[in-house]
Amino acid sequence: MKNLVGLDSEKAEALVVELNILLADYEIFYQNLRGLHWNIKGRKFFELHDKFEELYKDAFEKIDEIAERILTLEGEPLHTYTDYLATTQIKEEKNVSDGTKGVEVVVNNFRTLVEKERHILTIAADTNDEGTVSLMSDYITETEKTLWMLNSYLK
């Protein structure tokens, strides 16, 4: 049986499960970034405050895109923090004020995200879901570049 965009319904349902995990990951990542943005201190305050804001704004957009992709595949996006916390593979961070530690948190979160994005890309390709393939491909390209930049910052 096919869904409204012509994909195998069972395969699309399996993809929705993975996209919901990514959605939960991005929600917790977003909140981690907000906390870093608010709580960062020290000599690198201005540059990191701005960078964390840039990153949380980008994460916010991705959250909406992922939720809408889930809906396009006839799934239901997770939408409560209870569900996010039960589903996420990203650890909540609390009261991080050190710049280096904050960047390390972001790097670790991005590593988790890119691993999940690659996994979803593979499943989407096997499902012939070009919409999700395109979305994940764009995310992976962005995430890899950001990881390179943040790792360079830490050296």
Feature-to-residue mapping (PLM):
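Helix-loop segments that flank and shape redox-cofactor active sites
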Residues: 7-14, 28-54, 119-131
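Disorder-to-helix initiation segments
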Residues: 1-22, 99-102
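A structural signal for well-ordered alpha-helices, especially hydrophobic packing surfaces
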Residues: 23, 30, 37, 56, ...
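Conserved alpha-helical segments that form or flank metal/cofactor-binding pockets of metalloenzymes
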Residues: 44-83
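Short, helix-capping/interhelical loops that line the mouth of catalytic, cofactor-
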Residues: 39, 76-98
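Charged, amphipathic alpha-helical segments and their flanking helix caps
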Residues: 46, 53-64, 123-140, 144-149
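Acidic/histidine-rich alpha-helical segments that form the ligand environment
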Residues: 64, 68, 88-136
